[in-house]
């Protein structure tokens, strides 16, 4: 391959990746929970309910690196991975940058739509986690991440 052909091939590769469409996982490594560890508590039993289950409250400081996608329009989704333990449900409020919502294990839900205008997408979620009483073990990791869908 000649130098000119290699330069053209490289330019096409860069151009095609800049126009990518589809779903990508976003870098949310700076997102963390406060406190880092939380103890699930038994929910009060309510007559007529089959299972009171367990719940916990946690604050999630969200910081998503969006530099690579600045200027692009699309939707950001929160994804709650499922695992081999009891199903988890999360419900949250926000400070306004992201959408409040509700999700169950194995699902994803919209938390932002529009053009990404900054290098990071920041917000704070106040999240209530709920699980049935069939949850076994003393610890469980809250496995969630964020995805960006582009048209």
Specify the residue positions occupied by each region the protein language model found.
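Mid-chain, structured segments of secreted extracytoplasmic proteins
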Residues: 66-113
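N-terminal signal peptide c-region/cleavage motif recognized by signal peptidases
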Residues: 14-18
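Bacterial N-terminal signal peptides that target proteins for export
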Residues: 1-7
């Amino acid at each position: 391959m000649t130098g000119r052909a290699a330069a053209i091939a490289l330019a096409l590769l860069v151009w095609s990746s800049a126009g990518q469409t589809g779903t990508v996982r976003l870098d949310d490594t700076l997102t963390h929970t406060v406190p880092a560890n939380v103890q699930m508590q038994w929910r009060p039993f309510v007559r007529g309910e089959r299972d009171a289950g367990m719940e916990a409250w946690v604050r999630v400081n969200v910081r998503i690196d969006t530099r690579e996608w600045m200027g692009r329009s699309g939707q950001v989704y929160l994804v709650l991975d499922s695992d081999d333990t009891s199903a988890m449900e999360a419900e949250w409020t926000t400070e306004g940058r992201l959408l409040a919502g509700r999700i169950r294990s194995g699902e994803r839900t919209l938390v932002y739509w529009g053009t990404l205008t900054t290098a990071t997408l920041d917000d704070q979620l106040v999240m209530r986690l709920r699980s049935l009483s069939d949850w076994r073990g003393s610890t469980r990791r809250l496995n969630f991440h964020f995805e960006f869908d582009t048209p």
